[in-house]
Amino acid sequence: MKVTAVYFSPTGNTKKSVEAMAGALDPNFTVIDVTAPEQASVEREFSSEELVIFGMPVYMGRIPAAAAPRLQGLKGNHTPCILAATYGNRHYDDALAEMAGIAERNGFLIQGAAALVGRHTYGEIQVGRPDEADLEADRAFARKAAENKKMQSEIPGKYPEGEAAPGGHYKPLTSSACIQCGICRKECPVRAIGDDFQVGPERCISCFRCIRNCPVHAKNMDTPEYREFAEMFTEKLSKRRENEYFL
């Protein structure tokens, strides 16, 4: 079976999990990475003989507002699919239900869904996850889901009404250490970084991709307000949550 991994993954958590699943089913799987702005309007049709794994991060209980439209050009023809929502140890709320609604409207048949824990964008929460134990569980789940003709489990949550919030409160700063290499501008999912390499707060979705990818750590959130919040949030979400799999 030909497998395609589709994901929006600014900091790499979703990519790791989805590619682990895809690799367990097809060592030659195809990738459609809709994180990149140039993939925002990608179009592709899939047959009933293929399988697609969709992966999305959870922002405030939903999939990112910038990501949802990037799935609209991907159409199935009774195509089996697996859904994976990755979240930072708080909760995934309605994200899986939102993904399910989009997938079904676009012609996909859901054979499994997963709520997966990864490092949170903010603070130092679940650093190192997904770990190898997580990824091995993901692979085992994918093998079962691929053989699943009809889901027996109900996907938690409800399809949300209205548009998702555009992004979080905290917008990355740029220090004088910036060497203007252009990595942040090139890889920003929403082109929120200008010619001066500063982050435009009106477009930024607070994914922190630029912070994680900056080779000289010039992109940062080094403010008293953020440090205080991150310390509180890290403590609040310190208890490990386990992944949830639905078949």
Predicted feature locations:
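Short, charged low-complexity linear segments at domain edges
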Residues: 151-170, 179-195
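Iron-sulfur cluster-binding cysteine motifs and their immediate structural context
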Residues: 174, 179-205, 209-226
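A generic structured-segment signal
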Residues: 6-7, 188
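FMN-binding flavodoxin-like domain, especially the glycine-rich phosphate-binding loop
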Residues: 2-5, 11-17, 21-36, 42-168, ...
